[in-house]
């Protein structure tokens, strides 16, 4: 990969990989990605694009995704965050897995070693036959 920092706090990254197929009937997987992000002590913003060829080593099963991220530090103990993803497959081969996902939440730093992050997530499938899914989580981090 290649990482550029054209100005302070701005990061641009381009990278890729190739996973060789082990079976003669399979096709190798190529992953290509680009990322741009800005981060300072008050907030961060980022966007990413990913493209994968031959998903699960199957010829022509290409897919791509766009993601955006944001965090805002309200103070030293509280921050809010969000993420949005759009996933799609070439020629609709994975229509059940295509769609949009979103997440919003808050992180609370409780003392020096504990963080709690309640968050809400939604999955909105592209196919109209499946209803949206909604989830509520409470993530906890304990460190020493």
Model-derived features with residue positions:
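Detector for outer-membrane/organellar transmembrane beta-barrel domains
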Residues: 3-91
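Surface-exposed beta-strand edges and their flanking turn/coil or helix-capping segments
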Residues: 26-28, 59-61, 94-96, 119, ...
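Transmembrane beta-barrel architecture of outer-membrane proteins
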Residues: 29-31, 63-65, 99-103, 133-135
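C-terminal hydrophobic structural anchor segments
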Residues: 71-124
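Outer-membrane beta-barrel "beta-signal"
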Residues: 108-109, 132-144
């Amino acid at each position: 990969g290649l990482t550029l920092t054209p100005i302070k706090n701005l990061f641009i990254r381009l990278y890729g990989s190739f996973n060789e197929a082990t079976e003669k009937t399979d096709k190798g997987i190529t992953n290509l990605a680009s990322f741009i992000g800005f981060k300072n002590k008050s907030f961060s913003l980022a966007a990413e694009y990913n493209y994968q060829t031959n998903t699960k080593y199957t010829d022509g099963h290409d897919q791509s995704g766009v993601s955006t991220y944001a965090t805002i530090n309200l103070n030293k103990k509280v921050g809010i965050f969000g993420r949005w993803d759009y996933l799609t497959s070439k020629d609709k081969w994975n229509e059940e897995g295509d769609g949009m996902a979103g997440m919003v939440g808050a992180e609370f730093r409780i003392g020096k070693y504990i963080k709690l992050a309640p968050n809400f997530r939604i999955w909105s499938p592209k196919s109209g036959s499946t209803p949206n899914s909604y989830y509520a989580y409470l993530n906890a981090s304990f460190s020493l």
